[in-house]
């Protein structure tokens, strides 16, 4: 993801998940020596030596998201594929209508969109700043 572009590619959660290569990387605690002590200790206890390291992760979540001035319950799903990017999709309800949202960073391009009924755009963003933000989000969420 070193090259930053602004044209997003239409990729589904399933397509991104299926595109993840089978990992051949094995966890070696010696690779953690450069990390701060707290991070190193956490990872040494969380991952068994010799364990295969994942090339992707798929998460399901629920919580609250602030849209406008109010908090709304949401359910979401996210796929992070280390060599391609991430997609996060969520659904919430406002005034009885489903609102569908998504953030994505795929192959160096990013987009954010929210749609009423999954059809009518209420917010869309793309471009270099959105891509930079999305790449930062992916890095932050890569701890999962």
Describe each model-derived feature in a short phrase:
Residues 2-57:
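N-terminal leader/targeting segments and the immediate start of mature chains
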Residues 40-118:
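N-terminal mature ectodomain segment of secretory-pathway/periplasmic proteins
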Residues 114-144:
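Flexible, processing/modification-adjacent segments and terminal tails
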